[in-house]
Amino acid sequence: MSDKNSRIAIVSADKCKPKKCRQECKRSCPVVKTGKLCIEVTPTSKIAFISEILCIGCGICVKKCPFDAIQIINLPTNLEAHVTHRYSANSFKLHRLPTPRPGQVLGLVGTNGIGKSTALKILAGKQKPNLGRFDDPPEWQEIIKYFRGSELQNYFTKMLEDDIKAIIKPQYVDNIPRAIKGPVQKVGELLKLRMEKSPEDVKRYIKILQLENVLKRDIEKLSGGELQRFAIGMSCVQEADVYMFDEPSSYLDVKQRLNAAQIIRSLLAPTKYVICVEHDLSVLDYLSDFVCIIYGVPSVYGVVTLPASVREGINIFLDGHIPAENLRFRTEALQFRIADATEDLQNDSASRAFSYPSLKKTQGDFVLNVEEGEFSDSEILVMMGENGTGKTTLIKLLAGALKPDEGQDIPKLNVSMKPQKIAPKFPGTVRQLFFKKIRGQFLNPQFQTDVVKPLRIDDIIDQEVQHLSGGELQRVAIVLALGIPADIYLIDEPSAYLDSEQRIICSKVIRRFILHNKKTAFIVEHDFIMATYLADKVIVFEGIPSKNAHARAPESLLTGCNRFLKNLNVTFRRDPNSFRPRINKLDSQMDKEQKSSGNYFFLDNTGI
């Protein structure tokens, strides 16, 4: 599609039925009346064809179509003008740039592969923007002239005069141990090497990030969450003018996410810039002062919008429509009505109930006590608790992979499990993997419609499993876990590496699958928005991480979330437009009111 097309025509293959209508779209089109072939369709054709080059965007066919099969979407006409960077011919291009403001946190929100990391690289001075001229890149003088009149002009001028030092916390923290060469490998020593702030500040960072216990450990012995906290700490102990954090919340539990957000906010000063890319929308909301959305087509083009306030920006992203540019970048809005979830549930009297006894498990110094509980078919139980409180241990106990110390054995049930860490060892393509492991389900049309299609597996079906990115692997792992016939599905952190949009789709897929097939799912999830969307019941884990923990019996979403948030000392409210949970700022009026009334998690009437 050339950039000159200012609109895009969509004809839904499912809805368009030329055999059953009188081709109203073609008859009513003013361009066809002048003798041009703008819409081509006959009673025998399978689907109508609309020429985007000839289309004038009048929208008459959209109104006339009896099946609502046509959409005409206006694309931004200025896409050609605002190219900031293009890697090479026929490759990804980025339009415009986010504008950081001193003394404020800028949040970036958008799907994977749409240019967020490219934008960070350019703002950090690691990539020189070529304004789309990849064959003869412009000089800095010309680049600054191009951005004149905007806040970016001052920013790049400062950067050229070496006045700006930028630090990026990388997106994939798993690669950090390999990148650190040299004799110094201990966490504490590495932090000391980079330390440019006062010892009091550094002590405070170490305390809030809970790094005291790992200071003497080697960097390669750290878990994912510890590496993430170490990476945030490394960025914070250095003096810089621009701090950039690429996905600071992956691997962290809810409490650590909020601590990380507080630390990132504490870096602000009147002359400092802080930029943050984050897919957990509740953390992004808590963290940012204003946001830029990046929309477009993944690995084709990305467009950065003008800055908007946090609430406005996240709602625009969920809605998929930008009022300022009168542009729709997603066909449907992403909604968080917990009512959606329960409407699918038919009151089935024939649902089976299962129960498990109270259990105790000791692993080294760690002791986990589990209260007895019960669950039934078509039910999703979300486990909430900090890292290191035994959620994965309970999953393994239920799966029969671990034996309890005392208490009865767990009744034998078929179990399918998606582990937290996914290591691809399979030597073949995704299709071969599915055929080997879940052939029956994979060929089942219902499974294709419910799970495979919405997770967009078709885009990666013929790629080598070992070459997939984190998010692609996660989607494959979810399909594999759901494809194995079982009574109970145990899913550990389904949101890791997925972007905000995929997280919501993934929640819907898991939910629909569990309800339709009358199964039970136990899910560990730290993204609070996703957890509340998925949960029918909640199991709260309390105690001291890595020492002793107590898993309570399953309870309702409201009482469970209230108990969990009370332990964290955090309150949530609901956004009136999109119904998503939003974190109240600490000691704000809402925060104090909700704490005094004991309502930590708010399910107001509009959301039910």
UniProtKB/Swiss-Prot annotation:
Coiled coil: none annotated. The keyword Phosphoprotein applies. Residues 7-39, 46-75 form the 4Fe-4S ferredoxin-type domain. Keywords: ATP-binding, Cytoplasm, Initiation factor, Nucleotide-binding, Nucleus, Phosphoprotein, Protein biosynthesis, Repeat, Ribosome biogenesis, rRNA processing, Transport. InterPro entries: 4Fe4S_Fe-S-bd, 4Fe4S_Fe_S_CS, AAA+_ATPase, ABC_transporter-like_ATP-bd, ABC_transporter-like_CS, P-loop_NTPase, RLI1, RLI_dom_1. GO terms for biological process: positive regulation of translation; ribosomal large subunit biogenesis; ribosomal subunit export from nucleus; ribosome disassembly; rRNA processing; translational initiation; translational termination. Present with 6280 molecules/cell in log phase SD medium. NCBIfam families: PRK13409.1. This is Translation initiation factor RLI1. It comes from Saccharomyces cerevisiae (strain ATCC 204508 / S288c) (Baker's yeast). The gene is RLI1.
